[in-house]
Amino acid sequence: MSIKALILLDDASNGRLYLQAAQHLGLHPITLASDKAQCDMLAGEGMEAIRIDTDNLDGLIRECSRLSTTFDIVGITSALESVYATVGKLCRHFDLPGPNPESIERCCDKFVQRQLLAKAGVPIPAYRLAVNAAEVQSAAAEIGLPVVLKPAVGSGSSGVRLCRDVVELAEHTTYLLGGKHIWRSSPRMLVEEFAQGPYYSIDIMGDEFMGIASGEFGPPPHFIFQGTTYPAQLTSDECKRIADISLSCLRALDLEWGPKNIEFRWTNLGPIVVEVNPRLSGSPDPQLVKAAYGVDLITEHIKLVIGEEWDLRRKRSYVAAARKLVADCDGILDWIDGEASAAAVPGVAEVKLYVEPKAPIVRKGDYRDCIGHVIAASPSRATTEAVLKRAVDLIDWSITPFPSGDDAIAEFACAGLLG
């Protein structure tokens, strides 16, 4: 009997969780990735990884066909948004369960997504599309500052910035168009109204709602998550308003199959949709759901992918919270301590560091600025918050700034303290 294999395209923040969940389900995970370093790292961990251009659909079809002569390929998926439409095309070609690739492509283009949501009457921020600096300035003048300027395609808050005045607007426009931002296609930018208010996100599988989380960002102008709590403190009526709008989003975007994550801001006018993501949110959100409700969204997603019955029934009702550890300067990470002590605190569900000592730290103003996270969970919100604070306070690090332009060695270090 052939070994049952799950094909995974590229890697993401929760890619390792997909590999582990696949193995737990008795599957042999095979990663197809374009990054050689990623393949080498996975191979070093005993995982099967094949280097291939994941933007080449025909090449992927040939490789999957080759693998099917050895393995019983029971599913194809990815944790990465940029290749998720390709996943849908592969699933369609091999007659496997998967997302509608056309729906994914429409959703991943933030401008097209906005058009479809607006047509359906979904509350969204005012927006304009721009392809050059003049159009950015004109759009911002029409909408009114502050505005959010971001690439029309992308994820992880890469290239996303709050522009509070014309100087910040010009600076970020230059950044996006001046060669520093990597574009996968011709530059297209979204200029949109800054929807101000508490942040919430809802996780959905198919048409079933898993729950609503609240989130906190670090200081502007960037949108870097500092903390997430599951579930959010909302009334039943407030939850229903978010759920009803979410259903309208799914209908407008034809997103019936698989996992979704929808982001909101609760403004003076009520909940406004900031973004619809046609996939699971990245780490540590799946771990938060597992800590709060005992439901492994990644495992349930894989079950859906391979055509097995999936189950989102909650096994408990805890409050889970995560705190991101964010680098506060650029340089070389000298040391980071306290991981073991933090993990030993009763109520801590997970402590994860993304970097090791001597690693270079270069902040990008997005998810890549995070160097770790801590998750705590308990039946009580107050207890969870106290446990999380205690654990985070035990972790400390030091970053030595890079040498200055004259190559002088910096004589000081900036400490990473989270109070």
Give residue spans per PLM region.
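Extreme N-terminal starter segment of soluble prokaryotic enzymes
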Residues: 2-6
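A short, Lys/Arg-enriched amphipathic alpha-helix followed by its capping loop at the start of a domain
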Residues: 18-27
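Short beta-strand-to-turn element immediately C-terminal to the catalytic PLP-Schiff-base lysine
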Residues: 130, 160-165, 204-206, 267, ...
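Phosphate-binding core of ATP-grasp and ATP-grasp-like enzymes
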Residues: 176-180, 185-188, 193-232, 240-273, ...
